[in-house]
Amino acid sequence: MSNIPSELKYASSHEWVRNEGDGTFTVGITEHAQELLGDMVFVELPEVGDEVDAGEECAVAESVKAASDIYAPIGGEIVAINEELEDAPETVNTDAFGDGWLFRIKASDESELENLLNAEDYANTIDED
């Protein structure tokens, strides 16, 4: 069973969102998603300054098995990316909820967070997979 931290919010497309408390939100892919993908070989991240809409493709995770689009769980401006992943994409596998984060977004409308799942609801969606 995948680890699903209760303090995070989740998109049904397997991204997680952590509120940093300053109007920005850190985004990554869930442990479940990285388990499905397998060993990461490359992560393509958005550019700092990019504006994204909720549900928009904004990054790509490439593994030994497949390339998978990553969607913005909320809309806003990309304010930081995890540059460490350029040289160490496998960090997504080893620490999906920590050092394997992908990007940070300044939310344009925090009410979009209400459309995301809590840990229990996300767990129920992956149980159905």
Swiss-Prot record:
**Coiled-coil features, chain-numbered ranges:** none
PROSITE patterns for this protein:
BIOTINYL_LIPOYL, LIPOYL
Query: List-wise, which residues carry N6-lipoyllysine?
Result: 65
Answer whether the UniProt record assigns the keyword Zinc to this protein.
no
GO terms for biological process?
A: glycine decarboxylation via glycine cleavage system
Q: Which residues form the Lipoyl-binding domain?
A: 24-106
Q: Which cofactor does it need?
A: (R)-lipoate
For whether the record's keyword set contains Cytoplasm, the answer is no
Q: Which InterPro entries does the record match to this protein?
A: 2-oxoA_DH_lipoyl-BS, Biotin_lipoyl, GCV_H, GCV_H/Fam206, GCV_H_sub, Single_hybrid_motif
**Keyword set for this entry?**
Lipoyl
Signal peptide interval: none
What binding details are noted for the cofactor? Binds 1 lipoyl cofactor covalently.
Q: Which GO terms describe its cellular component?
A: cytosol; glycine cleavage complex
* Family statement: Belongs to the GcvH family.
Q: How does it assemble?
A: The glycine cleavage system is composed of four proteins: P, T, L and H.
Q: What NCBIfam families does UniProt report for this protein, alphabetically?
A: gcvH, PRK01202.1
- What is this protein's function? The glycine cleavage system catalyzes the degradation of glycine. The H protein shuttles the methylamine group of glycine from the P protein to the T protein.
Q: What is this protein called?
A: Glycine cleavage system H protein
Q: What is the lineage of its organism?
A: Bacteria, Pseudomonadati, Pseudomonadota, Gammaproteobacteria, Alteromonadales
